[in-house]
A protein has these predicted regions:
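Mid-to-C-terminal alpha-helical segments outside catalytic/metal-binding sites
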Residues: 14, 18, 115-153
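Catalytic pocket-lining loop regions of alpha/beta-barrel enzymes
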Residues: 1-96
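Ser/Thr-centric signal marking residues that sit
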Residues: 27, 99, 121
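Short acidic/histidine-rich active-site segments
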Residues: 93-111
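Active-site micro-motifs of SAM-dependent methyltransferase domains
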Residues: 71, 103, 146
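Alpha-helix N-cap and loop-to-helix initiation/capping positions
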Residues: 2-3, 109-117
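Surface-exposed loop/turn and secondary-structure junction residues enriched for glycine/proline
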Residues: 57, 79-81, 104-107, 151
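Conserved, mostly hydrophobic/aromatic
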Residues: 64, 87, 100, 136, ...
Length: 153
């Protein structure tokens, strides 16, 4: 956690509200500790914090949602009951997709594999949430643009 704290301190110190830094965070069994550090260092205020493949408790999920964190989901996450439930519960405005490719270090993958994985993820999330896949795709594209281009409010 020492390295994570140092990264968060540097990110918060150098982040510009007009073009905030984006932190992609994988919190394996440490969501509350990570949220504490993000809060203490100012990252929650000065950066865009994205939880990659979030698997913490429902209380931790609620805390991260309330802190305006973003969440990226992938097709592997959606294979678990918890992953599907979180994909259903997350506010649409804080939802992103990801691939988590390649599946193993050194394993080849292609742009087509990435596109297919994203399409499967969008289809699965649309089914879970009973949404039109095309409308969800548009919302996710809007979210990605906002994540990468909007100033902090």
């Amino acid at each position: 956690m020492t390295a994570f704290r140092s990264i968060c301190q540097a990110a918060a110190r150098t982040s510009d509200p007009a073009t905030p830094k984006v932190l992609s965070i994988h919190t394996v069994r440490a969501a509350n500790s990570c949220l504490d550090i993000l809060e203490e260092t100012g990252c929650l205020r000065r950066c865009r914090c994205v939880f990659h493949w979030f698997s913490g408790s429902s209380d931790e999920l609620h805390r991260a949602v309330q802190a305006n964190c973003w969440f990226s989901v992938n097709e592997m996450m959606l294979r678990t009951r918890r992953g599907r439930e979180y994909a259903r519960q997350l506010p649409l405005a804080q939802l992103l997709t990801e691939t988590d490719l390649p599946p193993h270090a050194g394993e080849p993958f292609s742009a087509i594999a990435i596109q297919e994985s994203l399409e499967r993820t969008i289809g699965a999330v649309a089914a879970i949430r009973r949404l039109n896949p095309e409308e969800l795709r548009k919302t996710l594209a809007t979210n990605a643009r906002a994540l990468l281009s909007s100033p902090l409010s």
